[in-house]
Amino acid sequence: MTNTERSSSWKASSIPDQPMWYFGYGSNMKASSMADRKVTPLSTKIVTVPTHFVTFDIFGIPYSEPSYASLEQFPDGGTGKLDLVHHISRTQVLPACGVAHLLSPNDFHRLLVTEGSGVVYNLVEVQAYEMNKDGQPIPAPFTVHTLKAKWPQRPNGTPSARYMVRFLGLLSSSTYYQY
């Protein structure tokens, strides 16, 4: 681990008595997913984590959910660039974008339990930057907690249709709140 990523304990007894920021980059970007888990964010911000990218490296269910999402740090402590190569084409891997939810201690714990933290995920701390209305990061980082694969699969798997609908739905929406 580097200075941009730090492991955290996920046990209920170690969760502080104050609200904590959680970085959602998959289904937790959608407000209805949070409601289904009976988690009510105190505040929500659209953010980026420029040191990490979204990857699909957790074994899933063949055909219906081939891989689950996780985060991985860019090379060189989060400062390196990374390209996907397919035959002769190259595509730059973009930094992780998602939402930061400010959660009460009880909601934070509930979210960790429903996500499988401690089983397939480790809880890590990373630095996030809120995005302004023009889609640019505001230069005031803050700490968020998020989940990362405990045992990443290599090579990475394929995202499911469910993830693709989430990502494309968010991209086609003019704001997160409409989505």
Curated annotation (Swiss-Prot):
CDD domains: GGCT_like (cd06661). It catalyses: an alpha-(gamma-L-glutamyl)-L-amino acid = 5-oxo-L-proline + an L-alpha-amino acid. Induction: Expression is regulated by the cluster-specific regulator verZ. Gene3D superfamilies: Gamma-glutamyl cyclotransferase-like. The keyword ATP-binding does not apply. Keywords: Lyase. Signal peptide: none annotated. It comes from the Eukaryota. The keyword Iron does not apply. Disruption phenotype: Dicreases the production of 11'-deoxyverticillin A. Disulfide bonds: none annotated. Pathway: Mycotoxin biosynthesis. Its EC number is 4.3.2.9. GO terms for molecular function: gamma-glutamylcyclotransferase activity. Belongs to the class-I pyridoxal-phosphate-dependent aminotransferase family. Gamma-glutamyl cyclotransferase; part of the gene cluster that mediates the biosynthesis of 11'-deoxyverticillin A, one of the dimeric epipolythiodioxopiperazines (ETPs) from the verticillin family that act as mycotoxins. 11'-deoxyverticillin A is required for normal conidiation. The nonribosomal peptide synthetase verP is speculated to be responsible for condensation of amino acids to form the carbon skeleton of verticillin, whereas the cluster-specific tailoring enzymes are involved in further modifications leading to the production of 11'-deoxyverticillin A. This is Gamma-glutamyl cyclotransferase verK. It comes from Clonostachys rogersoniana.
